[in-house]
């Protein structure tokens, strides 16, 4: 959608799932798999990141299943993985990942991931949590942006509107310039959860989703 994108690697372990999406969810992907800028690979995401140290990605997005015991994403929420991500990013790169529920009954995954990324101050000086309403989950869902140089809280509605216009983005149904700051305003219960339940996740002690 953004005309500034020159190349995009999509790393997805489940080839069968992608084939299903291509056929049955065109209203979501809008034939993006046919875009010449897109490169789809079916490999383990962690190994891909580890093998691409120095690749200078401007952005890495981790849209993953939860860290379930025995699941494929268990070690994609740990400090070691985040360090590999930092090494694969450019000097002003940005990392974004979905981080679990952002509701009052189960804020634990988000709190732990936020604390873990926050511990990597040398790699990611800016760590900002935000949330959105995901209709398929029927609850607010959390995301975290970790950046080497750019603080999303410094973006004004005017600057966001200008950038979207320059990039030819006109069809957003959720994210808008006026909504930007609201997304990054976490509820008070989430701020308390980060303080009370935040912990550093490692390969030896990963987060195990129990909800």
Model feature map: region roles:
Residues 1-94, 104-117:
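The AdoMet/dcAdoMet-binding core of the Class I SAM-like
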Residues 82-83, 108-134, 144:
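Conserved Class I S-adenosyl-L-methionine
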């Amino acid at each position: 959608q953004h005309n500034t994108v020159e190349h995009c690697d999509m790393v997805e372990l489940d080839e069968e799932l992608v084939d299903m999406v291509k056929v049955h969810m065109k209203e979501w992907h809008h034939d993006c798999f046919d875009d010449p800028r897109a490169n789809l690979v079916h490999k383990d995401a962690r190994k891909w990141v580890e093998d691409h140290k120095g690749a200078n990605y401007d952005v890495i997005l981790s849209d993953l299943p939860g860290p379930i015991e025995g699941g494929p994403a268990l070690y994609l929420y740990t400090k070691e993985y985040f360090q590999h991500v930092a090494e694969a990013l450019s000097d002003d790169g940005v990392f974004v990942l979905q981080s679990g529920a952002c509701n009052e009954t189960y804020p634990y995954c988000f709190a732990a991931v936020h604390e873990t990324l926050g511990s990597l101050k040398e790699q990611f000086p800016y760590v900002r949590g935000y949330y959105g309403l995901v209709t398929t989950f029927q609850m607010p869902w959390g995301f975290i942006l970790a950046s080497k140089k750019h603080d999303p809280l410094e973006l004004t509605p005017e600057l966001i509107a200008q950038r979207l216009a320059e990039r030819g983005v006109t069809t957003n149904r959720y994210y808008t310039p006026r909504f930007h700051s609201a997304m990054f305003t976490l509820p008070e219960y989430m701020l308390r959860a980060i303080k009370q339940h935040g912990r550093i996740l490692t390969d030896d002690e990963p987060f195990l989703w129990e909800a």
